[in-house]
Structures are given as C-alpha cells and as structure tokens.
C-alpha cells in the first residue's frame, strides 16, 4: 500500500471515529426526552470471522466509556427460562449502546446443534417468531435492535484454523462445534439462513473492510433510529364491567370453621408449591385496602422465607423509567421457586392509563405485550396465577378510616389513597378492559370479592390449588 493510500485510509478512519462519537453523544442527549432511544447490537456469526476483533476496533473508534459489551458463549436453552431471561437485566437505558456478543440466536443455534432432543423445524421457527416479536416489543418501547452476522467461507475458516497459534487450539472446538467438520459447518449455515434475512451480513474475509462495515452499520443505525409504531390510538371499545366488581354480598359473621380451614389450606398450598418442580408466579392487583397484603401473608405462612420472594411494586424509579416498562419485572423473575407480586406489570393498563402516565397508544399496545410476556413464562414451566381482589367503595372507606385510627397501620394510608377514590369508576373501566384482553387459558384471572376478608383468603388459597392442578393436568 503506497503512502497516499495509507494516508487516505487513516483519514477515513478518523472521520468514521468522529462520526461515531458524534452519533453516540447525540443518542446520549435523547435521555429523558420525548425522542429518547437506546440501541442493542446483537452479534453472532461463524467463529474466526472476526467478531471479537470488530468489537475491539469499535471500542477504539467510539467513546469507550459509553459503549457497553456483554460477552457470553452460547448456551443451551434452559427449559425453565424464557429465551430472553439471561439477557434482559442488561437491556440498555435511554441513551446507551449495548453490544450483546452472544445472544438468544446463538443459544438457539447451540440448542439446535447440540441438544439431546434436536429442535424440529416447527419449534425452531416458533422460537424465531417469538424472538422477533420480543425484539419488536423492545423497539416499540424505544430500544432499537441491530442484528449483525459475521460470515466466513469454509475455505477461509480452514486456512485460519491452519494458521492459528497452537496455544489457541481450543478455538478448534469452541462452543462444542468442531470447526473442521464440514457437515456441522453446513448445518449451521443452513439453520442461520432461517433467521438472518433481517440481519446485516458482514463478510469476514478482509479484516479492514470487515471492521469498517461493522462500524458503518452501527453509525447508520444511530443516525436513523426509526420512530417505531407511532400509530394513532384505536377507537376504543370499552369492555362491560363484570358484576363482581360492583355487586357485593354483605360480609357474614365470623365462620367458626375459618381458622381450621385456613390452617388446612395454608399447609396444602405450601406443600403443593414446595413439591411442584415448576416455577410459580402469583400476581395480585386490586383496589387499595382490598386485602392483598393479608392474602399474601396467608399464602407464605407455612413456607420458609428461603423458598419465596415477595416484590411490592411502587411507582417506578427514574432509572426504571429509562427502560421498557416490563424491564423491572423481567429482572425480578430470577427465582427458581415462588415469586409473589403485590401489584404488577398491569400497572401499565391500570394506574398509568388512568393517571395519563402512558399514552393511549402505549396502554392499548400493552395488552398484546403482556400476553406475549405471560405466554413466554407459561411456555417455560411457570405457573402464573393472577388475582384481582375486589372491594366496594364504602368498605374501602371504612378500612381507610380504620387504618388512620390504628397506630401500626397508619403508614398504610396516604392522601393519594383518598384522592384515588375520585377516579374509582375510571379504574373499574380499566380493570374491565384488562380482564377482557388478558384473561387467557395459560394465565387466567381470578376475581375475588374481598368485602368478607376471611372468605376471600380462603378463596385465594383454593384458587392457587386449583390452578396448580389445572396446569399440571394440561402438561
């Protein structure tokens, strides 16, 4: 290469670096703005095609303080986890760039190539469809996704293996694949063509061109982050409000059998959940003072604290608002045992809808996003049990007043609780739509009238036993 050509190449690299840094800072400046975005870069490809070198070069061209890289070898799918679960904790906040060097597509290929029970074509394509739907949900929630496949011909791969330093011979069978095996190479290439039609394909033959093309693809993505799904709100058809939300029986006098029945059921529930090899997620929603805390207390009464996690959900923190609204729930589903939510992801279609924190387009879209989320859980050996605890307005007022006059319960009542009563009917309408759009065979709603606290607690425990048995019978 002559001096003039070298000088031109250096100049081009300097300009590319400057362009990348400017685009990087432009993205950072969208944080907390109406046009806020983040970028996820999924990197996969043939080994020795230069993925690692391209990522290292990218770090030299951008401001490395604000480029995040998560690098993991592919692993087989865990049947008790949705495909996205190992990664969602690392979803970037607004203004951030995250490279996932190793991602769910690598896991899909590893599973298809190595699992003792190979994936058939239908299941493989179902995974791809679910992955694309998840990526679209990310995009709709301001996380753009760039997918890059580094390719390399069989001939070039073999030459690079021949030229390798003996100390790096472990690459020969990296990730369990024998890269000297032409049949395995061909199988991998055939499989990846079933999902890379919407990927940027980078030819790994020429090192300089490879690095430049990778950086250029990222620059293009940063400069042209699309406005995803900015659709007009639908003409909304309000669902009818179920009678159980408005018609309540007068609470009965204390049942003489209540304590013995409660004792029996708490033990049965503990035994059933403890002996079940699936994960159990129990979700509570309902009006304030409807008895969510009391019901949860009875559910865990016979369990050891090490067997369960309880998450009490309040208004999101600022760092949570900078990510998709489901992110703070994805990150709370790490337990392999029992997880209980005192308020849930349904805040998107309840309080965020009623109080105007979510736009009409956002809360209308959320029903489908939530259904996909719950379907992913259900398909990953998780029993999802959802409760709405219903109470009438007069009983709620009586419980509020009782809290105010009880020293150890005063902390449970605030001015906001009283103010929310002004929007009672709006919350009922939101709840009715929620039931209409998210009551599914894999995650049904149990609506429990709680004017009678004792009867409500019994019904909650019975419903848990019923759902555990129903899901087991359909497995």
From Swiss-Prot:
Species of the source: Acinetobacter johnsonii
Q: What GO molecular function annotation could you give as one example from this UniProt entry?
A: kinase activity
What is the name attached to this protein's record?
A: Polyphosphate:AMP phosphotransferase
Task: Answer whether the UniProt record assigns the keyword Kinase to this protein.
Answer: yes
Cite the record's note on assembly: Homodimer and homotetramer.
Catalysis performed (reactions): [phosphate](n) + ADP = [phosphate](n+1) + AMP
Cofactor stoichiometry and binding remark: Lower concentrations of MgCl(2) are required to obtain optimum polyP synthetic activity, whereas higher concentrations of MgCl(2) are necessary for optimum PAP activity.
The free-text temperature note is: Optimum temperature is 50 degrees Celsius.
- PPK2 2 as annotated region, ranges: 256-472
Quick one: which gene encodes this? pap
pH profile of the protein: Optimum pH is 6.5-8.5. Optimum pH is 8.0-9.0.
What are the required cofactors? Answer: Mg(2+)
Which parts of the sequence are annotated with region: PPK2 1?
A: 18-222
Q: Does the keyword Nucleotidyltransferase apply?
A: no
């Amino acid at each position: 290469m002559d001096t003039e050509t070298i000088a031109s190449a250096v100049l081009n690299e300097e300009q590319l670096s400057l362009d990348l840094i400017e685009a990087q800072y432009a993205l950072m400046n969208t944080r907390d703005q109406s046009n806020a975005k983040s970028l996820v870069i999924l990197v996969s490809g043939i080994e020795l095609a230069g993925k690692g070198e391209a990522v290292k070069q990218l770090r030299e061209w951008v401001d490395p303080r604000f480029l995040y890289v998560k690098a993991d070898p592919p692993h087989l799918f865990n049947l008790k986890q949705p495909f996205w679960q190992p990664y969602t904790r690392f979803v970037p906040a607004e203004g951030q760039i995250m490279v996932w060097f190793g991602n769910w597509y690598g896991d899909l290929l590893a599973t298809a190539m190595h699992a003792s029970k190979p994936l058939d074509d239908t299941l493989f394509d179902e995974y791809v469809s679910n992955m694309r739907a998840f990526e679209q949900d990310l995009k709709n929630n301001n996380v753009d996704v760039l997918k890059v496949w580094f390719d390399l011909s069989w001939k070039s791969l073999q030459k690079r293996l021949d030229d390798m330093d003996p100390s790096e011979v472990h690459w020969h069978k990296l990730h369990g694949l024998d890269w000297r095996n032409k049949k395995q190479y061909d199988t991998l290439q055939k499989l990846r063509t079933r999902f890379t039609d919407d990927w940027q394909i980078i030819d790994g033959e020429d090192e300089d061109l490879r690095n430049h093309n990778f950086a250029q693809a990222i620059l293009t993505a940063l400069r042209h982050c699309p406005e995803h799904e900015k659709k007009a709100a639908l003409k909304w058809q309000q669902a009818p409000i179920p009678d159980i939300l408005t018609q309540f029986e007068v609470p009965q006098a204390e049942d003489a059998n209540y304590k013995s029945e409660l004792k029996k059921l708490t033990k049965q529930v503990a035994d059933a959940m403890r002996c079940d090899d699936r994960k159990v997620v129990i979700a509570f929603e309902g009006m304030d003072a409807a008895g969510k805390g009391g019901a949860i207390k009875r559910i865990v009464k016979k369990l050891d604290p090490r067997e369960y996690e309880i998450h009490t959900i309040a208004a999101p923190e600022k760092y949570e608002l900078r990510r998709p609204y489901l992110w703070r729930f994805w990150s709370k589903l790490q337990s392999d045992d029992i997880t209980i939510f005192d308020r849930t992801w349904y805040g998107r279609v309840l309080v965020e809808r009623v109080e105007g924190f979510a736009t009409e387009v956002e809360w209308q879209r959320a029903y489908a996003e939530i259904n996909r989320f719950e379907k992913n859980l259900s398909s990953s050996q998780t029993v999802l049990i959802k409760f709405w605890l219903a109470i009438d307005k007069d009983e709620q007022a009586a419980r509020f007043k009782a809290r105010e006059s009880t020293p150890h319960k005063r902390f449970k009542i605030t001015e906001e609780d009283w103010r929310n009563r002004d929007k009672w009917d709006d919350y009922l309408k939101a709840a009715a739509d929620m039931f209409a759009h998210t009551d599914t065979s894999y995650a049904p709603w149990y609506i429990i009238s709680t004017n009678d606290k004792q009867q409500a607690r019994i019904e909650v425990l019975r419903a848990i036993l019923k759902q555990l048995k129903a899901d087991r019978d359909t497995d």
